Amino acid sequence: FYVEDFYLFIYFISLVAIFFIFFNFNYNYSSIFFSLVSSISNIGISLNDTPSNLYFIFLVLVIIGGSFFSTSSGLRFLKLYSLIKFSINELLSHSRPKHLYINKFYFSDTNIERSDLYKYFLSVLIFVISLFIVWFLLTISNIEIEAAFKLAILTLMNTVNSSMYNLSDISFFNMSFITKLILIIFMIIGRVELLTVLILCKKFLFKK
C-alpha cells in the first residue's frame, strides 16, 4: 500500500531525527537507534546500554507500532493519523461551518472513508479496554502495578520484554499457571486483533 509506506517512511525519518537531536545521551546513539527500531517494529530486543529513562517513550512507540517488519503489530501509525486528522477537521468544521474539510491523505488522491474511521476508532477502543483488563488481571496476580501495566502493553502488542522497558527483572518462570494463561490468551488476541475475532464470532454465531 503506497500511501501507508510513504507515511511510515516520513514517520521513521522524523523519529530518527528527533532521537538524534534530543536523546543522544553520552553519544550512544547506536544503542538508542537499535531500541527505536526494535520498538516501532514491536520486536522488543534492546542492548544493555540503552538509557532506562526513555522507557516511557519506547512504550508509546510500541503502542503506535507502524508495521515495520511486521504485519499486525501496534495500533498502526496510519490509523492514528487518520483519526487525528478526522478529529481536527470535525473541530474546524464546527468553528468554520462555511468551509469544507475533506478527510484526505496528503500527497495522495485517496480519501479516508468514514467506515474505515469507525473501524479504526473501534480498534483503539478495544485496545484500551483490553489493556485495562490485562492490567487488572496481572495486578491481582501479585505483580507490581507499574510492571503489570508495562507487561499488559507488551503482551497486547506481542513485544518481548527487555531492559529498555525496565522489565528485565520479571521472571515468567515464577509466574502462576493462571497468569501465564492470561498472557498467552491476550497475546493471541493482540496478534489477530480482537475486532477480527468479534467479526468472526458475529458471522458464525448470528447466522440468519
PLM region descriptions:
Residues 1-208:
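Membrane-proximal intracellular helices of multi-pass ion channels
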